[in-house]
Design a protein with these regions (language model features):
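Short acidic low-complexity segments
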Residues: 31-44
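Short loop/edge segments at beta-strand edges and connector loops
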Residues: 36, 74, 103, 181-184
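Glycine-rich, N-terminal phosphate-binding loop of Rossmann-like dinucleotide-binding domains
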Residues: 52-53, 133
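Short, Asp-centered acidic motifs that coordinate Mg2+ and/or phosphate
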Residues: 10, 48, 128
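N-terminal Rossmann-like dinucleotide-binding module
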Residues: 1-29
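Alpha-helical elements of Rossmann-like donor-binding domains used by nucleotide-donor carbohydrate transfer enzymes
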Residues: 21, 40, 48, 60, ...
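Beta-strand-loop-alpha-helix segment that lines the small-molecule cofactor/substrate pocket
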Residues: 46-48, 54-55, 59-106, 121
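Predominantly a Rossmann-like dinucleotide-binding segment in NAD(P)-dependent oxidoreductases
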Residues: 105-193
Length: 197
């Protein structure tokens, strides 16, 4: 998508062949830097990073960037443990750098329209809300995005990645949840797990 006021200055990926494709496509003026080492990229003169790496790496990579003096836009979710969340918050507070989690679901056209109506006052005050996010995928599609049992998507409880469901209510109403309850149906045996936080 087009975004004014920004310039793609550097890209980091563990796979050099991917970097070559990106450089060929986006290095229009010959200044795009490419790195296979994230720490080396952080030494460069860039202002901010966009983290689109694996879920379980987000907090570590964000904290490194903040401590290197970079602003951070992180794909969701921000962390995989409470301890990582605390460390991430501390890094933001200590560095004074801007951090944003890039939860995209609240910014779809439908949710933006609901927010407009809610902000107008037509709906009144929100006292209770429910949200859901259903993303059914075939086994082949699931394997494409999570190949193998050791892929991060297969190593976390499903409710750890609940941002699509809850972020839309938080954004529309500009509120924080008091209590959250969730369950994950199991397609294979139709059982489910319930989590409450």
């Amino acid at each position: 998508a087009e975004c004014t006021g920004l310039k793609l200055a550097a890209v980091c990926d563990r796979r050099p062949e991917k970097l070559a494709v990106i450089k060929a496509k986006y290095d229009t003026d010959g200044t795009l830097m490419t790195f296979t080492d994230y720490d080396e990229m952080l030494k460069s003169d860039i202002d901010a990073v966009i983290l689109a790496n694996y879920f379980n790496e987000h907090a570590e990579f964000a904290i490194k960037a903040l401590r290197a003096g970079k602003h951070v836009l992180s794909e969701c979710t921000a962390m995989s443990t409470l301890a990582e969340g605390v460390a991430l918050c501390r890094a933001v507070e200590e560095t004074g750098k801007i951090y944003m989690i890039a939860e995209n679901y609240p910014y779809t056209k439908q949710r933006l329209e609901i927010k407009r109506v809610y902000d107008s006052g037509e709906l009144g005050e929100m006292l209770y809300g429910e949200a859901e996010y259903c993303h059914p995928m075939s086994n082949n599609t699931t394997f494409k995005y999570a190949p193998g049992e050791y892929h991060w998507r297969n190593q976390i409880p499903s409710t750890y990645y609940c941002t699509h469901a809850i972020a839309q209510i938080m954004h529309i109403t500009d509120t924080m949840p008091v209590r959250v309850n969730g369950f994950v149906p199991r397609i294979k045996d139709q059982s489910y797990r319930e989590y409450e936080y």
